[in-house]
Swiss-Prot record:
<keyword id="KW-0442">Lipid degradation</keyword>
<feature type="active site" description="Proton acceptor">
    <location>
        <position position="654"/>
    </location>
</feature>
<feature type="binding site">
    <location>
        <position position="47"/>
    </location>
    <ligand>
        <name>Ca(2+) 1</name>
    </ligand>
</feature>
<dbReference type="InterPro" id="IPR000008">
    <property type="entry name" value="C2_dom"/>
</dbReference>
<dbReference type="InterPro" id="IPR041847">
    <property type="entry name" value="C2_cPLA2"/>
</dbReference>
<protein>
    <recommendedName>
        <fullName>Cytosolic phospholipase A2 delta</fullName>
        <ecNumber>3.1.1.4</ecNumber>
    </recommendedName>
</protein>
<feature type="domain" description="PLA2c">
    <location>
        <begin position="281"/>
        <end position="825"/>
    </location>
</feature>
<feature type="binding site">
    <location>
        <begin position="339"/>
        <end position="340"/>
    </location>
    <ligand>
        <name>substrate</name>
    </ligand>
</feature>
<dbReference type="GO" id="GO:0006631">
    <property type="term" value="P:fatty acid metabolic process"/>
</dbReference>
<feature type="binding site">
    <location>
        <position position="111"/>
    </location>
    <ligand>
        <name>Ca(2+) 2</name>
    </ligand>
</feature>
<feature type="binding site">
    <location>
        <position position="53"/>
    </location>
    <ligand>
        <name>Ca(2+) 1</name>
    </ligand>
</feature>
<dbReference type="GO" id="GO:0005829">
    <property type="term" value="C:cytosol"/>
</dbReference>
<dbReference type="GO" id="GO:0016020">
    <property type="term" value="C:membrane"/>
</dbReference>
<feature type="binding site">
    <location>
        <position position="103"/>
    </location>
    <ligand>
        <name>Ca(2+) 2</name>
    </ligand>
</feature>
<dbReference type="InterPro" id="IPR040723">
    <property type="entry name" value="cPLA2_C2"/>
</dbReference>
<dbReference type="Pfam" id="PF18695">
    <property type="entry name" value="cPLA2_C2"/>
</dbReference>
<feature type="domain" description="C2">
    <location>
        <begin position="14"/>
        <end position="133"/>
    </location>
</feature>
């Protein structure tokens, strides 16, 4: 509860951060949808002794934040309502009407009997449609509804869209209390609370003490057909009317003229009437969220700088006679898989080898997930890391990896974590176990918590001196779906953070801040990168259903469920029961079924961040856009009212919980990666991540070479594989390095056989029962660290010829062919 000035103004970005928004602006008219709930038939009994006591709720989230309700018809299986509700709708967004039949219960929570979703775009303007919904495909239950669509004379609304997401015009309502001449209140009423609600607004509900003057704001859609509701309440522990509201009041927002003040009275029993002053006005139309599937201007500028570095490195590595033109420079990307500390150490070895071979400067993109991000985040603390000897950061890692993880939970460390988390909470963040995990990681890997930020890594890109780092995470549903049934890639780079699926991005320093309808509402201090590492490598965020799927399908990449629906299919949620997204055995609305479902799909250790897409709506044709592909195993993609823009917070987890690959970042339009260097860190499944990437790519219509290792390759993998498709020049060439100990057993360096005294150093136990390299081991002896590092270093150096061959192949392609633009991802 607040008193005083509480106006929340939208934050603004510097002009340079507002450039590069290739979205479309279009004026779109409003329509008026009238919904008349007529009657239902053959509703089931509530119990053995009586019929149901049904009522219907009517909701259209894209038009109003309010949920309307019919009267309850008692003890009836054939209730008749004949009640009418009205919505002002925007015709260019996906409007899904939700009708839910409840059985009212005086003692327990009302039960949901049936739920229907209907796409109102099927109704033509001027058409009166009577619709009968079958509530149960196997039963006689039905609901009759009358629907009327009419054009209105309201001024058209200017929309901003990338044809998937839509940002609508925003208004702000300023509310202030005028207490002139009413300085005294009746006895016992000086502690009254004034609660104001504007459903569908950014603020939703605000509560104040009316004994002092105050000013505050609500931010809401200009075309939102809703009202401001107010309640004057007595404190619960007082005797003054404590159990009821005092004469609730409401103000339809459509009655307020923009820019003009309105004064209304607050009814108060036994007290002088206070007066509320209301004034509404338009918000600036500029967005803080970039709506585009293309690359941001900062990345495009980086590419131009980096190509000069890559061109010089390729000329030297391939002994070219002439300099390369910018359009002849191939794009090389690293795909670093996850694998905990094992992945971190191995990646150091792989990068060290590329540096020794003079090939690290040939890389443009450096993508990683899970444990690989620990290496990446450490290296990019130094803006010149790839130009310096990597032995420095490797020695740092060796020193800290040798420490036991238990030391990070000593009392002095716990006190430090508590203080840091308290400060984070005071800054406005929601603190979770994942944040604590990030602090433990930071202390383990670096000995202290530092103030490094993701945006600070831009210094490492200013001259194109390093590859662009890309960190990948997954957004999932918090409690009611397993990862396989709903997952969305979220990409983090020093420039921006965003969803590959929706084409919505924000500057990296604004991740965690609060947004509404594409506008920055509340800016929070940028998170330290350790908290992001807590997201990127949080394997504890899986739920029991994820573990079950991993046990069932983990060893068979062919069963990996990444199929994508035909994006041209029509919206599938026109009418039906519920959302259709749960497994049948979890669909029951009983308390026991819901409790079991929550137990199996709950994520107690996930990270929660403010959703920067919150409030944005989906375009009426979003499902037909080539960049938006729906998953074959996820009906939720066809249910816009349940997609991410409707959620106030994100639920972010380790991307390795779904697919142990960072390739989706390399598939984005505009990146046009020619060569992928794939580093595998799986102990027993050397091709799983790459085969998942291939299946994912093909399901989305992306060119990708066939990854078809033989049974012998699975059981005894080689050090390096080259996969390409000569018949499809658009497909990238892939170099794949499994984590394997092959010729390193008897070679200390490429072409140098080990002496008898050196053979022990070549024995690296990667998969045995006594292997120190298992996933959850966080402490390595120096000897084990060095063997894994040297093995990874050797495997890359020993295949220098294959790497150079791949570089020549993609260089030849670049020189002889023009790459098509706008490749679908």
């Amino acid at each position: 509860m607040w008193s005083g000035d509480r106006r929340v103004g939208m934050e603004s970005l510097s002009p340079e951060r507002l450039h590069g928004h290739p979205y479309q602006e279009e004026a779109s008219v409003f329509c008026r949808l009238t919904v008349k709930i007529l009657e239902a038939r053959s509703l089931p009994r509530a119990d053995l002794l009586s019929q149901a006591d049904p009522y219907v709720t009517v909701q259209l989230p894209t038009a109003s934040g309010m949920k309307f309700k019919t009267q309850t018809v008692t003890n009836s299986s054939h209730p008749v309502w004949n009640e009418t509700f009205s919505f002002l709708i925007q015709s260019q967004v996906k409007n899904i009407l939700e009708l839910t039949i409840y059985d009212e219960d005086v003692i327990t929570k009302d039960d949901i009997c049936f739920k229907v979703s209907y796409d109102v775009s099927e109704i033509l303007p001027g058409q009166l449609l009577q619709k009968t919904f079958s509530l149960n495909p196997q039963g006689p239950e039905e609901l009759d509804v009358e629907l009327l669509m009419e054009r209105t004379w309201d001024p058209p609304e200017n929309l901003i869209t990338n044809n998937v997401l839509v940002a609508r015009e925003l208004s702000h309502l300023d509310v202030s209390l005028d207490r002139a001449g009413n300085t005294a209140m009746a006895a016992g009423q000086d502690k009254l609370e004034l609660e104001l609600m504007l459903k569908g607004s950014y603020e939703d509900t605000q509560t104040f003490f009316p004994d002092t003057a105050f000013t505050f704001s609500f931010h809401y859609m200009r075309g939102q057909d809703t009202e401001l509701n107010g309640y004057l309440r007595g404190p619960r522990n007082s005797g003054w009317n404590s159990d009821t509201s005092v004469t609730p009041f409401n103000v339809p927002l459509m009655s307020l003229a923009a820019g003009k003040e309105m004064t209304i009275d607050i009814p108060a029993m036994k007290a002088p009437e206070g007066k509320l002053q209301l004034k509404t006005d338009c918000c600036p139309k500029e967005l803080s969220v970039r709506l585009s599937y293309g690359l941001c201007p900062e990345e495009q500028a980086f590419l131009s700088r980096r190509k000069k570095v890559v061109a010089a490195a390729l000329k030297q590595a391939l002994q070219l006679d002439e300099d390369l033109n910018e359009d002849e420079v191939p794009v090389v990307g690293i795909n670093a898989e996850g694998g905990g500390m094992r992945a971190m150490i191995s990646l150091y070895g792989h990068l060290l080898a590329l540096q020794k071979l003079g090939l690290l400067d040939c890389v443009t993109y450096f993508s990683g997930i899970s444990g690989s991000t620990w290496t990446m985040a450490h290296l990019y603390r130094d803006p010149e890391w790839s130009q310096r000897d990597l032995e420095g950061p490797i020695s740092h890692a060796r020193e800290h990896v040798a420490k036991t993880l238990l030391k990070e939970f000593l009392p002095e460390h716990l006190a430090s974590y508590r203080q840091t988390l308290k400060l984070r909470e005071e800054q406005g963040y929601t603190v979770t176990v994942a944040d604590l995990w990030g602090l433990v990681l930071e202390s383990k890997l670096h000995g202290q918590v530092t103030d490094q930020k993701l945006s600070g890594q831009r210094a490492a890109l200013e001259r194109g001196q390093n590859p662009l780092p890309l960190y990948l995470s997954l957004n999932v549903k918090e409690n009611h779906l397993e990862t396989l049934h709903f997952k969305e890639w979220v990409e983090f780079s020093p420039y921006e953070v965003g969803f590959l699926k929706y084409g919505g991005f924000v500057p990296s320093e604004l991740f965690g801040s609060e947004f509404f309808m594409g506008r920055l509402m509340k800016r929070l201090p940028e998170s330290q990168i350790c908290f992001l590492e807590g997201i990127w490598s949080n394997l504890f965020s899986v739920n029991l259903m994820d573990i079950w799927y991993d046990i069932t399908y983990g060893k068979d990449s062919n069963n990996f469920p990444v199929d994508v629906r035909n994006s041209e299919k029509e919206f599938s949620g026109s009418a039906g029961t519920s959302s259709g997204v749960e497994a049948p055995w979890l669909e029951s609305g009983t308390a026991l079924a819901q409790a079991l479902k929550g137990f199996l799909t709950g994520r107690p250790f996930h990270q929660r961040s403010a959703n920067f897409l919150h409030g944005l709506q989906l375009h009426r044709d979003y499902c037909n856009q080539r960049h938006f592909s729906t998953w074959a195993d996820c009906n939720l993609d066809d249910t816009p009212n349940q997609l991410t823009p409707q959620d106030p917070q994100l639920c972010l987890i380790d991307a390795g919980c779904f697919m142990n690959s960072s390739c989706p970042s390399l598939f984005r339009p505009g990146r046009q990666v020619d060569l992928i260097i794939s580093f595998n860190y799986n102990q027993s499944l050397p091709f799983k991540g790459l085969q998942q990437s291939e299946k994912y790519s093909r399901a989305r219509g992306l060119p990708f070479p066939r990854v078809e290792p033989s049974p012998e390759d699975h059981s005894q993998p080689q050090e390096c594989y080259l996969f390409s498709d000569p018949t499809c020049p658009e497909a990238p060439v892939v170099l794949h390095f499994p984590l394997v100990n092959d010729s390193f057993r008897d070679h200390s360096a490429p072409g140098v056989r080990r002496s008898p005294d050196e053979l022990k150093a070549g024995q690296v136990n990667l998969t045995g029962a006594a292997s120190p390299y298992f996933m959850y081991n966080m402490t390595y002896k120096n000897e084990d660290f060095d063997r894994l590092l040297q093995l990874s270093d050797y495997n890359v150096q020993n295949n220098q010829g294959t790497i150079l061959q791949a570089l020549r192949t993609v260089l030849k392609r670049r020189a002889s062919e023009t790459r098509p633009l706008g490749v679908k991802t």
